[in-house]
Amino acid sequence: MNHDVFISYSSRNKPTALAICHVLEEHGVRCWMAPRDIPPGADYGDVIDEAIVACRLFVLVFSEPASLSQWVKGELNLAFTEKKIIIPYRIDETPLKGAMRLILNQTHWVDAYPDAESKFGELVEAAERFLGRPAVGAFRTEPVVPPSAPTPAPARRYKVGDYY
């Protein structure tokens, strides 16, 4: 598997997870997320296990549905066991409980509510930092407009007898 980040999320938060994936990939961070990256006919559990083991960074889209999802809990537990860097991206005010509280209590969060897109820049910068990539400038949410073409230099005129 060839990815940097595993994105864990509840299917009820799929639009947010897809947006996070898109933004990270626009910045050159290779992402893995189910079901997008699960080959047809493959066993979900086996492929997800392999993807978490192979990732360098684990992004958890944390919400009430995620806190109740057995899949998300299992993915988080495996990431913790494998000593992955975990970045929780909180999209609502759901409190931590149970095993999630034990795992995430000492982790710095990206608090992205009520507007889940408001902290995409912070997430991109954190991912680049943890992946050891140099900062390439400020995070942009709008396309960069290229500068206009430079004005050509005036043509040089030669006189008879000039050496060039």
What do the predicted segments below correspond to?
Residues 94-106:
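Glycine-rich, charge-decorated loop segments at or immediately adjacent to ligand/cofactor-binding or catalytic sites
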Residues 49-52, 103-108:
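Short, hinge-like loop/turn segments at secondary-structure boundaries
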Residues 90-91:
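SF2 helicase/translocase ATPase core recognition
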Residues 1-61, 65, 70, 80-85, ...:
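Conserved N-terminal substructure of TIR/SEFIR domains
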Residues 109-115:
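Short acidic-hydrophobic, aromatic-tinged amphipathic segments that line or gate anion-handling sites
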Residues 156-164:
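Tryptophan-anchored aromatic micro-motifs
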Residues 85-87, 108:
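Proline-centered loop/turn at the N-terminus of a beta-strand
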